[in-house]
From Swiss-Prot:
Gene3D superfamilies: Hypothetical protein apc22750. Chain B. It comes from the Bacteria. This is UPF0145 protein lmo0208. PANTHER family: UPF0145 PROTEIN YBJQ. InterPro entries: UPF0145_dom_sf, UPF0145_YbjQ-like.
Length: 110
């Protein structure tokens, strides 16, 4: 399945626009990562634990969006947007949302 931020797919004709599809992931950030991130913030540097969590959440949101597109008969998602939000009383939760337009493009070998 082609997933792109572009509003079209070069060289492919969109045959049908299905609907907007979403993938949402909410994940908690654990205490040990918080301690490590705090030290890195103090001394400067990157928090690999947080970065890994962010990457995993983003990839899962995209997979979920793709699956929802497949479920309605689409073979591509265009105009993809990914949003991030910090939630919770202690800002201890991360929400990642992927959204796009599910479409059917002309026959392909993907």
């Amino acid at each position: 399945m082609i997933v792109t931020t572009s509003p079209n797919i070069e060289g492919k004709q969109i045959i049908e626009y299905k609907k907007i599809v979403f993938g949402e992931v909410i994940t908690g950030v654990n205490f040990m990562k918080d301690i490590g991130a705090g030290l890195r913030n103090f001394f400067g540097g990157r928090s690999q634990g947080y970065e890994d969590e962010l990457i995993n959440a983003r990839e899962e949101a995209i997979r979920e969006m793709e699956q929802r597109a497949k479920d309605i008969g689409a073979n591509a998602v265009i105009g993809v947007d990914i949003d991030y939000e910090v939630l919770g009383a202690d800002n201890g939760m991360l929400m990642v949302t992927a959204s796009g337009t599910a479409v059917v493009i002309e026959a392909q070998d993907y």
